[in-house]
Amino acid sequence: MPVLLYNQINPGTLQHLLERYGMVVKGVAANNPIPGSFWRPPEAGLAGNILFVRNDTPVHSALHEACHYICMDQHRRNKLDTDAGGDYEEENGVCYLQILLSDHIPEMGRQRMFRDMDEWGYSFRLGSSQAWFELDAEDVVAWLRRYRLIDDDNRPAWRLRQ
C-alpha cells in the first residue's frame, strides 16, 4: 500500500492543526524543489515556522518535520533552516508526537501512520512503529511530558518546547 500523500488529505486540516503551534503550511508547485527539505523532494521542508509541502509529499513526512519544530528548543527554532538536528531522545519524541497528531487528520489516523512509517523505513528495535509506540516508548513519553508537549493522558498539549 503506498503511503498517504498531501494531495490525499484536506490541506485545511493540516494547516489548522499546525496553526495551533504557530506554524504555516506552504504548498510548492509540482516538480519544483521543496525549500528546507533535508532529504530532498518529495520530503517536506522546514524553514523557521514554515512547513513546505508538495502534492506528492507524504503526510508522515509533513508531520515528522512539523514535530521537529515543536520538539526543538526556542534557540534552535530561531535559526531553523532545513536541518532540524536534534538528539536521539528528541528524534524519538518527534516520532511519537507525529503518531499522536496523525489522529487529528481524518484521512490518516494512527493505524495508517504506523503502516506508512513502517513502509517508508522508519526503524524501531521491536520491528514496527506500532510495537515501539505501544510497548517500548516509556522513555519517550517521559521526555515529552518533561517538556510539557503531551499531557498526563498522552494527548498533545498544543505548545512548543521552551
Regions found by a protein language model. Name each.
Residues 101-117:
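Short helix/loop segments within enzyme catalytic domains
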Residues 60-74:
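Active-site recognition of the HExxH zinc-binding catalytic motif
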Residues 51-59, 86, 90:
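Secondary-structure capping and boundary motifs in well-ordered enzyme cores
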Residues 87-89, 119-128:
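Short, mixed-charge aromatic SLiMs
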Residues 36, 70-100, 114:
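Post-HEXXH active-site segment of zinc metalloproteases
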